[in-house]
Amino acid sequence: AYNATPGATDAALFLGMINSFSHNTKVTAGIELAVQRNYPKGSILNPDNEYTSNANPWAQTVTLNNIGFGAVSRAMFCFGYLEEAFCIDGNWGAWQGQGTAKDGTAYGFTNFEWLGGSARGAWCFKDGEPLAWAAWSQMATIGDAEEFESTVPPMFYLGRKLLPGYFGSGKYRGGPGESAVHWCVEPGKHIGITRPNGGLSSTASVALGMNGAYPGPSSFMISARGTNLDEVNKKGLAPRDARELLEMTDSGELKVDDLQVWKMDCPELSMKNNDLFVDAAGSSGGWGDPLDRDPNAVIEDLNSGVSYFTNTSRGT
């Protein structure tokens, strides 16, 4: 549910304020004194129905808060506090669902690794960092793949890595987002997967590129059902991220009966043996005009694999 009580909304706002422009790890009375809030009665942040579910206020408040935090970051820049000025993004992701094991045991699950940490947007003087920041947590961590595998019995990681080119370009680029490929193995009687997401389910990701830079790309996921993964695995060529999966599909190396790229919350997807589910999130925006980027930084990104080479030409 995307409703929230005023108290829960305050909690989401205050946590984000700490990470965005405050030098502390705890909420203090200073925030209460410094910030004015207005939650109109009957709005989703102050429902007039006392029985309204309000279990997930972060989903929509992240996007709303980022607008405010971005404005504060611009103000820091204008006042000359350059070390405090960066592009504030909250492009989180997660996936959830339910299943029934072979013996009839029912279970539910959530994989929230891309909620634990996302990329920090570009600073006004340097590139952003991957996985190092989250507006809603003072200790960003995406957790261990093995732990998430233990909570979703049929789904195993084929890859979990930063996605090349998955950031907002600028004089200083944003930190790259991340992608994981999940392999369905002997799912029992049933497993269904859906996807809640801050950039898909409630609102679009806020375009937060600063001073002429591009914003970070929004989250997305891919479902590949009915594959020849057994043959691909024998060659040791299983896809490790979203880009590799699409490239292998285009080349015919990976055969897929039903391939879907989801840029919105997907309906429940029933997964079978050797089906693949790919998610990508956590990208961030850049700072400054991309044409002003140091050519040596462009070369370094290409050599390190943070960016990828695209051979294009444009006529006039």
What are these regions (language model features)?
Residues 1-316:
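Glycine/proline-enriched, intrinsically flexible loops and inter-domain linkers
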